[in-house]
Regions:
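Single conserved hydrophobic/aromatic residue that forms the stacking wall/gate
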Residues: 3, 235, 242-245
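Glycine-rich phosphate-binding loop
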Residues: 4-19, 144, 150-208
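A generic local secondary-structure boundary/capping motif
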Residues: 51-57, 110-113, 162-166
Length: 246
């Protein structure tokens, strides 16, 4: 049964009642980590009928994928607070990049790029400022690229990469990034197509040992709660189930 192999996850959160970091760590991040959904796949595509905020862009001009590492990186839970409420107060949170964690997301990204017509991959980095983890990321990208000789690849520091998303979105095909950088880019990309309101997101366990999870990118919109105007399953052609949960 297809419904036993995947999870449809609606937007969650009510910032006025519960801080976002609590609702996120207590729900979505638990799914990602406990089900080893290490790939976050975000298609970025300008759809017919949705005007892009970028000048002279039409459907077909913006069409690429963002692959985000989804279970480690900058969003690790390793860290803490010392000397709270004193002048010596210190907070720390460590970035974790394992070889297996980095390589498996890079392998997925290169394989996807190899299946596309453009056969091009872009890596997001910041190795000119983050002096340990990002040079390691670059090293693993270069090593993985040797296994995919047909794929052309390049890398950009995250700041200028954001600028290119706005100025030259048509140049991209597959973009691969660490957890934090991928999180930023996967909102910026859909925004360039006119709205994040219809942007999809997949949290994937490619080996299918665990179910994958699919969600909208947009927020929970608590301001329209109780009005009966949110059609949460219509977009996946499930009107019957929509009626059940409405």
């Amino acid at each position: 049964d297809v419904y036993k192999r995947q999870i449809f996850f609606g937007s969650v959160g009510w910032p006025e009642k519960i801080p976002d970091h609590i609702s996120l760590w207590g729900s979505l991040l638990k799914f990602r980590r406990e089900f080893d959904q290490y790939i976050n796949l975000r298609p970025v595509k300008l759809m017919p009928g949705v005007p892009s905020p970028l000048a002279n862009r039409k459907p077909g001009d913006i069409d690429f994928y963002i692959i985000r590492e989804n279970t480690e990186g900058e969003y690790s839970s390793i860290g803490g607070k010392m000397f709270p409420d004193t002048e010596r107060e210190i907070v720390m949170q460590e970035t974790i990049m394992s070889r297996v964690g980095v390589d498996r997301v890079l392998k997925f990204a290169f394989e996807l790029a190899n299946k596309t017509e453009k056969k091009h991959l872009t890596s997001a980095t910041k190795s000119n400022g983050i002096s340990i983890t990002m040079p390691y990321w670059d090293e693993r990208v270069e090593n993985m690229a040797k296994q995919y000789s047909e794929v052309k690849w390049d890398k950009y520091h995250i700041d200028i990469l954001c600028a290119h998303f706005v100025l030259n979105p048509d140049k991209f095909n597959v973009v691969v990034a660490s957890n934090l950088f991928g999180d930023i880019l996967s909102d910026l990309g859909p925004a360039c197509t006119g709205t994040i309101g219809i942007a999809p997101s997949g949290n994937i366990n490619p080996e299918k040992k665990f179910p994958s999870l699919f969600e909208p990118v947009h927020g929970s919109a608590p301001d329209i709660a109780g009005q009966g105007i949110a059609l949460s399953l219509i977009h996946i052609s499930e009107p019957t189930r929509q009626e059940v949960i409405s």
